[in-house]
Amino acid sequence: MKIQENYFYKLDDLKEVKVIWKKYDKANILEIGVEYPTAIVDLDRFSGIPITKEWLLKFGFFIVKTNGLIEATLPNFRFTLNQVKDYNGFFFCENENVLMNIDYVHEIQDLFSAFLKRDLVFSDSVS
């Protein structure tokens, strides 16, 4: 898993944290700083946060439920995230074509950054 600054991950499978800085030695990450509680932690303590409807709402997505399907959209973003019954992640779609599965918060942050060249932000604090 690639660790990015300003992305959210799960620390020790317990607490959701935002990475605020990384320190490198050549190509290797030596230290990672996270906010609240401020700490320096090892890379192997991070895991992905499962993507949920609540996380998408924090990022400003609009959620619509119809016939067992959840569709998440953003203004001025031509792609949608769709979730079907009995699947925990979302399908990243263009029109009705599934482009890939999204299972974690950092994956939607990566996609958003790649397509729009800016970070996905939200106003709610992570608790």
Question: Where do the language-model regions lie?
Answer:
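Loop/turn positions that initiate beta-strands
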Residues: 4-6, 12
